[in-house]
């Protein structure tokens, strides 16, 4: 079986989101949903999207490519890229086990070690717990960081951003993280769409006791996310 390092074809290299060259998934990742391509389609500018993601991007009157901002039009099936996804192996960031690229989506939803990998990313943006308390925003509803829309629950905010702002590249503060006791209200995510889809697939408010310290809080989130798998 092939390793996840061959030269990319069908525009896969251009379609990949900005990522470390050491990430074997970066060349096979849809820039909209940030998952391994499903039914990849290559558009005229050379970039590649999942078929379903492309359909969403084509809905505006004047659709543009979310990667290069050129005019967007229906594309053609990326047959060679699809073949690679069905034959190339990569490893899970959590358990390090190898999987075919087409199977990695399903695996990470049930891998407890991958959940730990995700939470390490959350902790990387936290503040020192010894800082003075501050006014904490409403943790149950959130404003959109891109537009005036507000009063979204967590799931609603994720869906709104995916449908309305998937091509917006502006750096913004995550309103969900900013509402948490450990959150930094001045920290701007360089890729907010990736952040919100990878970090906020479950609700912190359901899982944590806000009276405990940061480490205990993170552990509570992890334990519940593992149980709920």
UniProtKB/Swiss-Prot annotation:
Keywords of this entry: Acetylation, Cytoplasm, Developmental protein, Differentiation, Metal-binding, Nucleus, Spermatogenesis, Transferase, Ubl conjugation, Ubl conjugation pathway, Zinc, Zinc-finger
Top EC category: transferase
Pathway: Protein modification; protein ubiquitination
Catalytic activity: S-ubiquitinyl-[E2 ubiquitin-conjugating enzyme]-L-cysteine + [acceptor protein]-L-lysine = [E2 ubiquitin-conjugating enzyme]-L-cysteine + N(6)-ubiquitinyl-[acceptor protein]-L-lysine
Gene Ontology CC entries for this record: cytosol; nucleus; plasma membrane
Description of the deletion phenotype: Mice show no significant difference of viral resistance or augmented antiviral responses compared to WT when both are infected with virus.
Enzyme Commission number, as recorded: 2.3.2.27
N6-acetyllysine: residues bearing it: 103, 113
Entries under PANTHER family matching the protein: E3 UBIQUITIN-PROTEIN LIGASE RNF114 (PTHR46016:SF3), ZINC FINGER, RING/FYVE/PHD-TYPE (PTHR46016)
Protein name, as recorded: E3 ubiquitin-protein ligase RNF114
Originating species: Mus musculus
Classification lineage: Eukaryota, Metazoa, Chordata, Craniata, Vertebrata
């Amino acid at each position: 079986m092939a390793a996840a390092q061959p030269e990319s074809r069908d525009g896969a290299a251009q379609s990949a989101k900005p990522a470390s060259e050491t990430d074997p998934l970066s060349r096979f990742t849809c820039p909209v949903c940030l998952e391994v391509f499903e039914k990849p389609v290559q558009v005229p500018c050379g970039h590649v999207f999942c078929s379903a993601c492309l359909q969403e991007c084509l809905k505006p009157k004047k659709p543009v490519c979310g990667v290069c901002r050129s005019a967007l039009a229906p594309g053609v099936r990326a047959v060679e890229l699809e073949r690679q996804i069905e034959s190339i192996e990569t490893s899970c960031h959590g358990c390090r086990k190898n999987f075919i690229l087409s199977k990695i989506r399903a695996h990470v939803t049930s891998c407890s070690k991958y959940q730990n990998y995700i939470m390490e990313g959350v902790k990387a943006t936290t503040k020192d717990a010894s800082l003075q308390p501050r006014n904490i925003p409403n943790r149950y509803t959130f404003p959109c960081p891109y537009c005036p829309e507000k009063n979204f629950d967590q799931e609603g905010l994720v869906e709104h951003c995916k449908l309305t702002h998937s091509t917006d590249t502006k750096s913004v503060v995550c309103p969900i993280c900013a509402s948490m006791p450990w959150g930094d209200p001045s920290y701007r995510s360089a890729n907010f769409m990736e952040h919100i889809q990878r970090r906020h697939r479950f609700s912190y408010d359901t899982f944590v006791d806000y009276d405990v310290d940061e480490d205990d809080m993170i552990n509570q989130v992890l334990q519940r996310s593992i149980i709920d798998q």
